[in-house]
């Protein structure tokens, strides 16, 4: 467990925040700092086929230790952290034997309160790693990286545990939706894989949102305010009218489970032009089609009211629900469930209210459900992880590798 924690703390000390505004891959050069460190560690573990390409994708392989054919499987995690909060100068706190108290996050004035974060009530006796309240932690997804490498080290140190080829992949830019864009599935050469990018212990996910970006562009006319009567058209007022036409109960803060939403995420405004940036989510293709049609209907209604085509809608699909690509391969899910049960972990199968690299990879021919890391409150200063949960993730990875070999003997 010490080795696991040391790896994790080493990784979170490296700022790898991605940048959605940068077109290149990786979107930030600093992601390569972690990629290069991981290459060194993979070579120290004497793994085969260790590589990092110009875009920051890291790959390696632990060769099979059995003399019969076993399907190669993969484990994938991402190196970048979310743009939502700073990932620079992360100062983790380790809370030993948590007993239900409110945790003070450094000197920031922020805290983890069990009333606000009730998951803490289920973690009595656990060792926690938190932030100091000024940055995110980076458990999403550096915990996954640490867990994968620790599991590989355990397999190497215990050759009596049978396993086939284990393929390892670490990706850039997952948090900005591009993690799988340049992933070389053929080079990776696994039959299926698992992203280690989930939350609390037991999470096993093979459904995710269908995702679309919706840009609503409102055009106005700017005239000096002193002579504006009958001439000025304020695009911000048009944008406000459009937002008021959207359902107030179908937002992230008002939905859960399999419910989709519209989320106004950004706005760039001026009198002459205002752009509203929405993300639209739904678990079914039919539901997504209805949401797109609804937005277009509201744009058309507003344009008719304004008597001029002053509102545009640009829809861009981001990713799709991997369920349709994973369900034809039920053994992929059954193996993960079998491994969790063998490790005294209760599988908690639920939809991902978001996306992972695995969603894109599944549509690229690599079925790739998602497994827990043991972390909570990703993307913000209240992010934390349990060391106990990290250890359980390692155990499950090792057991998946072992059972895959035993099941194919």
Swiss-Prot record:
The entry's localization annotation reads: Cytoplasm
GO BP annotations, alphabetical order: peptide catabolic process; proteolysis
What's the domain of life for this entry? Bacteria
* Enzyme class, spelled out: hydrolase
Q: What is its EC number?
A: 3.4.11.4
Instruction: Identify which residues the record assigns to the active site.
Output: 80, 174 (proton acceptor)
Q: Which UniProt keywords apply?
A: Aminopeptidase, Cytoplasm, Hydrolase, Metal-binding, Metalloprotease, Protease, Zinc
Q: Which reaction does it catalyse?
A: Release of the N-terminal residue from a tripeptide
Q: Which residues bind Zn(2+) 2?
A: 140, 175, 379
Q: How is the cofactor bound?
A: Binds 2 Zn(2+) ions per subunit.
One GO term of the cellular component aspect? cytosol
SUPFAM superfamilies attached to this UniProt entry = Bacterial exopeptidase dimerisation domain, Zn-dependent exopeptidases
Q: Name one GO molecular function term.
A: zinc ion binding
Record keyword Manganese present: no
Q: Which family does it belong to?
A: Belongs to the peptidase M20B family.
Q: What does this protein do?
A: Cleaves the N-terminal amino acid of tripeptides.
PANTHER family, sorted:
PEPTIDASE T
Q: What is this protein called?
A: Peptidase T
């Amino acid at each position: 467990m010490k080795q696991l924690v040391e790896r994790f703390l080493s990784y979170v000390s490296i700022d790898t925040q991605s940048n959605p505004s940068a077109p290149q891959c990786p979107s930030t050069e600093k992601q390569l700092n972690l990629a290069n460190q991981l290459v060194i560690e993979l070579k120290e573990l004497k793994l085969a086929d260790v590589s990092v390409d110009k875009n920051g994708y890291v790959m390696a392989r632990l060769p099979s230790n059995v003399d019969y054919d076993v399907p190669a499987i993969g484990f994938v995690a991402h190196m970048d952290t979310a743009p939502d909060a700073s990932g620079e100068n992360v100062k983790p706190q380790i809370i030993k034997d948590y007993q239900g108290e409110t945790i003070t996050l450094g000197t920031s004035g922020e805290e983890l309160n069990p009333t606000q974060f009730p998951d803490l009530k289920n973690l009595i006796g656990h060792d926690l790693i938190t932030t100091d309240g000024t940055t995110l932690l980076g458990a999403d997804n550096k915990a996954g990286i640490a867990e994968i490498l620790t599991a590989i080290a355990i397999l190497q140190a215990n050759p009596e545990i049978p396993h086939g080829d284990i393929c390892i992949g670490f990706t850039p830019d997952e948090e900005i939706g591009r993690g799988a864009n340049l992933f070389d599935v053929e080079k990776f050469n696994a039959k299926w894989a698992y992203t280690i990018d989930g939350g609390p212990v037991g999470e096993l996910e093979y459904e995710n949102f269908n995702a679309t970006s919706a840009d609503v562009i409102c055009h106005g006319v700017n005239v000096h305010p002193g002579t504006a009567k009958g001439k000025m058209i304020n695009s911000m007022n048009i944008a406000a009218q459009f937002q008021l036409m959207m359902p107030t109960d179908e937002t992230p803060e008002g939905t859960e489970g399999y419910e989709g939403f519209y989320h106004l995420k950004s706005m760039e405004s001026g009198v002459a032009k205002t752009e509203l940036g929405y993300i639209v989510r739904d678990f079914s293709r039919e539901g997504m089609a209805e949401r797109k049609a609804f937005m277009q209907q509201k744009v058309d209604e507003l344009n008719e009211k304004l008597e001029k085509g002053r509102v545009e809608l640009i829809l861009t699909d981001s990713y799709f629900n991997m369920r349709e690509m994973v369900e034809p391969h039920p053994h992929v899910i059954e193996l993960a469930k079998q491994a969790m049960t063998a490790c005294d972990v209760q599988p908690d199968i639920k939809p991902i209210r978001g996306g992972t690299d695995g969603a894109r990879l599944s549509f690229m021919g690599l079925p790739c459900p998602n497994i827990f890391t043991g972390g909570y409150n990703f993307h913000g200063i209240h992010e934390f992880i349990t060391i106990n949960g990290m250890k359980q993730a390692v155990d499950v990875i090792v057991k998946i590798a072992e059972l895959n070999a035993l099941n194919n003997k």
